[in-house]
Amino acid sequence: MTSSKSVHDNYTITCRPFEEDSVKELVKTDSRLSNWPVVYILSSPKEVYVGETLDYDKRMRQHLDNTQKQGLQVTHVILHEKFNKSVCLDLESTLINLFTGDGQRKVLNANNGIVNADYYLREHYRRLFDDIFDNLRRSHKLFSHSKSDIENSDLYKYSPFKQLNEEQKSTVTSISERIIDRIANDHSDLLEFIIEGGAGTGKTILAVYLMKLIADYGSGYTIDDGPGPLAEDNLDFPSVIDRRHLNIGLVIPQASLRDTIKKVFRSVEGLDASMILSPFDIPKIVLDR
């Protein structure tokens, strides 16, 4: 592929082959790629990974050594003279959800918790994000659908990478810490949580979010594989997690919602449509054990 660079409103999007020599040459062109907050995208026609880092050079070398990233072919790096850590975390989360909603590539990110945190001039940067999305779609062909179409899709609505408000963050933290502690200590007795709320209060979104979080724990992801500060601030994740097989499932009575969530799970690494169950599947699972 040919390399490219686009410049817009004080930010640049640079595209290079995801190869050691190509990344080395790119880093030589701008010293900030070794000491500046950036957002980057690694992609192939079927997969995508989004990250943020203060040291793009070092992070790319880590990814190039990661066998899970060897199928990725292209790196895009988004650089702005006024980016900071908070802006990059927000843009990273925004792009991950948009890629999930677009549905054209499997999203490889883990979910270590994404918090809907406010920061200085957030609305200004959010308008900039719209421009960045348009350029990634039109100039770099990374998205197939418009932003409005994506945001109105079920894939976007039920993305497991949704940003959490403070109440949701507290609920997820309380539940996931206790579940992961029990898994780590091989406890198998019943543990019940009841989350109450009317229609439209986000119960399904929380369930999908927790499924991804627990699946990533069992897959042996490290903290660096996923976006967001929740794990750093609250969740007691070890920095490196032992890989273990977990039988996890989400029981959904409504057939139409089951079909929708299955589509979401097919588009996200670590999740699988077979994890979505009807109430009638439960006796079969019990008998098979």
Each model region followed by its residue ranges:
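Conserved RecA-like ASCE P-loop NTPase motor core of nucleic-acid helicases/translocases
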Residues: E192-K212, L230-L257
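Conserved RecA-like ASCE ATPase "motif II neighborhood" in helicase/translocase motors
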Residues: S267-R289
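Short secondary-structure boundary/capping segments
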Residues: N66-Q68, V264-E269
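Conserved adenine-nucleotide phosphate-binding loops and their immediately adjacent elements
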Residues: H145-E167
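N-terminal pre-P-loop "Q-motif" helix
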Residues: P160-L191
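GIY-YIG nuclease catalytic motif and its immediate N-terminal context
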Residues: M1-K58, Q62
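Post-Walker A helix-loop "phosphate-sensing" segment adjacent to the P-loop in P-loop NTPases
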Residues: L213-G226, R244
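Structure-specific nucleic-acid interaction/processing domains
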Residues: E47, Y56-K141
